Amino acid sequence: MKIVGDSEHFKQPYDSNDEYVSKTEDKRDCEAAQKVGMELVSLSKTQLDKIELDEHLYDSIQQAHKIKPKTEAYRRHMQYIGKLMRNVDIEPIKASLAVVLNKNSNETAKLQMFEKMRERLLTQGDGEIQTVVEHYPQLDRQKLRTLVRQATKELAKGPESKSSKELFKYLRSEIQD
């Protein structure tokens, strides 16, 4: 009886020195590509224009904006976008996406900072005006004091006031951090 050892006949595809990718790994990669596609669909047109995409992929994302979410057609279209994403190098898209999303979070943080500053100005009065003017010397103290006074008077009458909005706009336009 002849014992057959490591013959070519018994070798499996994963026995070679090539890197073997399991089905599970392949599925994970496909799902990751589809998630990136979903993030791209959630962006606005101006944000999407900042990311360099394949023309066919860009058109598909634009079509996804026209389909109602939570429908079967939307789900199928998202799978199609995932399929297109598998044929494209995802890393540069992820990097561009991170830049676009980070810029948005920075903008939101700035607006929240102005909102908090306005609230402090309205609640603490002249002491806070002095602190803000010392920190941001480009602000006109007299105009700031006038806006705070008007907004405080209007807030006593009702919740949102025109002067309060003007104060916010003034802070946002004058402070460039």
From Swiss-Prot:
Location within or outside the cell: Cytoplasm
Disulfide bonds: none
A Pfam cross-reference name: DarP
Source taxon at top rank: Bacteria
GO molecular function: ribosome binding; rRNA binding
Keywords: Cytoplasm, Ribosome biogenesis, RNA-binding, rRNA-binding
Role, per record: Member of a network of 50S ribosomal subunit biogenesis factors which assembles along the 30S-50S interface, preventing incorrect 23S rRNA structures from forming. Promotes peptidyl transferase center (PTC) maturation.
The protein's name: Dual-action ribosomal maturation protein DarP
Start-end of Basic and acidic residues biased regions: 1-12
Lineage, broadest ranks: Bacteria, Pseudomonadati, Pseudomonadota, Gammaproteobacteria, Alteromonadales
Family statement: Belongs to the DarP family.
Any Gene Ontology biological process: assembly of large subunit precursor of preribosome
InterPro entries the record matches: DarP (IPR006839), DarP_sf (IPR023153)
Region Disordered, residue ranges: 1-26
Gene3D superfamilies: PSPTO4464-like domains
